[in-house]
């Protein structure tokens, strides 16, 4: 977490000692500022097309509730995604009798990501109502071809739902380019915010939908505190209807706003370039040692997986990492590497040294 973000959080906690500075307008200025920064980050048409959602599972529950699908239809998802982007569809398939097509990665090394993308496109048919995937896979950084998925979805009348948690903030994303129907993102990852915070985009498909939660702030005219007991049937226009209760959260919301503002200032394209320039020489060294890494066209620069050659042992390489204070994530048989602006060449040198020791063992 950025120091400036932490400072805002600490200050907000102490502000609770004297809440007199909070005016009725503060509830809505807070949320508008956050939505505005997120809309800028993903190129959304307006802040009102975005909603503050505390988690991916919360946002996807809203998507699931409003998906127009039933028995005889199907949904297509990539396999081994983060659980939130499976459980929502697994539950919905059982509830409504919708077929859930889970597309696994092929058991191959060369061309694995390209073939996986092809398999996803092949799984989409005229009964498909939704495709749900990430921009990059959370375990190994496999990049999914969102433009091709959107094109195929248009051909069959399906919607596209993107979990952007592992990419938004570090990998450029454009609503106008990819035309997703929904984009959900947790704030604690590449947007560098606190836990229990996040923002989502809901497109035209969802603009007249029904949210999973009925709170006072997602109702029409909730800005008028004097008339809150004049209960409203109508929701706020746009995507704000899907916002979580207490979205004005005077601690988490300003923290995430500041974090995304900083990411916007840096620019995801610059972060991606920095990560590419930082890692490229060391990726070449790792490949020479037999480590398997996806081709550049089909992986993120900010997140990618390393798969060990047969003569290296996962438990032993983890020991090498521990000795060198290298912090990575093990996801199945993939070692997930996720650099950012705070990483230096010396970090990558220590990483490669761990593999060199194993290669000579």
What are the residue ranges of the model-derived segments?
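Pyridoxal 5′-phosphate
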Residues: 1-361
């Amino acid at each position: 977490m950025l120091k400036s973000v932490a400072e805002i959080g600490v200050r907000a906690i102490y502000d609770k000692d004297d809440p007199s500075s909070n005016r009725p307008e503060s509830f809505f200025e807070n949320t508008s500022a956050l939505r505005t920064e997120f809309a800028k980050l993903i190129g959304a048409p307006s802040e009102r097309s975005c909603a503050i959602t505390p988690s991916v599972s919360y946002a996807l529950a809203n998507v699931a509730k409003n998906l127009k699908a039933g028995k005889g239809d199907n949904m297509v998802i990539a396999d081994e995604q983060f659980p939130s982007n499976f459980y929502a569809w697994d539950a919905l398939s059982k509830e409504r009798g919708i077929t859930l097509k889970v597309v696994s990665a092929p058991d191959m090394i060369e061309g694995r990501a390209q073939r996986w993308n092809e398999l996803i496109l092949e799984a989409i048919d005229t009964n498909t109502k939704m495709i749900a995937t990430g921009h990059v896979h959370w375990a190994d950084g496999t990049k999914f071809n969102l433009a091709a998925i959107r094109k195929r979805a248009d051909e069959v009348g399906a919607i596209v739902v993107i979990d952007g948690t592992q990419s938004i903030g570090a990998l450029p994303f454009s609503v106008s380019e990819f035309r997703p129907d929904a984009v959900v993102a947790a704030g604690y990852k590449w947007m560098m915010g606190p836990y229990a915070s996040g923002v989502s985009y809901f497109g035209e498909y969802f603009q007249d939908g029904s949210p999973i939660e009925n709170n006072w702030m997602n109702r029409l005219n909730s800005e008028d505190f004097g008339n809150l007991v004049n209960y409203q049937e109508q929701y706020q226009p746009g995507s704000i209807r899907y916002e979580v209760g207490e979205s004005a959260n005077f601690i988490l919301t300003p923290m995430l706003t500041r974090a995304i503002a900083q990411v916007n200032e840096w620019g995801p394209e610059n972060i991606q370039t920095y990560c590419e320039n930082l890692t490229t020489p060391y990726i070449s060294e790792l490949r020479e040692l037999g480590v398997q890494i996806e081709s550049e066209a089909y992986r993120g620069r900010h997140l990618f997986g390393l798969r060990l050659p047969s003569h290296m042992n996962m438990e032993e390489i983890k020991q090498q990492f521990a000795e060198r204070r290298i912090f990575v994530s093990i996801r199945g048989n993939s070692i997930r590497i996720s650099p950012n602006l705070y990483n230096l060449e010396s970090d990558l040198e220590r990483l490669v040294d761990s593999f060199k020791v194993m290669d000579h063992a």
